[in-house]
Amino acid sequence: EDKTLGLFHGKLGACIYFYVSSNYDEDSLAYQTAKELLVQIVQKVSSVKSIDFDNGVMGLSLGLSFLMKNNYVEDTSISWLSRMDNYVYKVAVKTLDMDIKDNDFLYQVDILVYEVIRYNELKDNYKKELCLRLIKALFNQIYLNRPVNFFSEAIPFTIHDRLISFLFVLLEIRRLGICVPRIDRIFKEMKMFLFSLVPILNPNRYSLYLVSSLVAQVTDDIEWMQYVERLKKSVDMEGLFTKDMYDMSILPINGISGMVLLMFLYNRYSNNSISIDLERVEDRLESSLFWKRFQNDVSFMKKYYSLNGYCGIR
């Protein structure tokens, strides 16, 4: 029995999968399985000390919030969300006074992503104001204290990349009307560092192209537009979902499923949309040796059963 509770690699990811699969049928095996998993999670959630998305408090909070918003569970978990918010807030405030090492920089970007998501969900004006102040402090600190290799590609490919995540979350903060002049100034300053980057890996060119295109659209900056065109020409869309990833690379965080998620996110906010042959993508997913290994390798199954694995792909 897996003792991990987390969103991407633990029980909460599986819990969400079974609730969604149940189609709200309370008599179904999927619903009952989800309900049992939720009981196990709630019993142990207070013991979680890490705050990351994978297996920590931020992932648990967002997962429980999703279940409540979609009426899979009652709002009785609201007290847990409040406690989790308070815990993350305290940790986040501490990081503002810390000298963040290069390897931990994504950790701070993740906190910013979490706070922006929660800002959209919070109803309490006092908590919303605290969250807003933290968002302003965090994004400025991240930008001003970024490491020298911040404008570089992630190898191997992952959608959970600090540069891509930071650009996406800046766009969302701007969309909310928060510090728009400051963010536009950051986008302008970024040009001298970012525009020399054309990633080696095709999936990295694709993800940078998507987020840069959104920046170009909101800023209406001709230089951003030119950079986007250069990236677009360098992306092999034909081979992106079929040839660029090795057979097992179908996971949501660092595989084909993740690239599809990025496309949906882009289409949601963009003035134009990208379309791919989803049937070909589905064939590619189904033909992967991932499924055979998942059935035959117990250690592999335990590692990849949750949202960044079986449940997320399904």
What spans do the regions from the language model cover?
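Glycan-recognition and catalytic cores of secretory/periplasmic carbohydrate-active enzymes
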Residues: 1-314
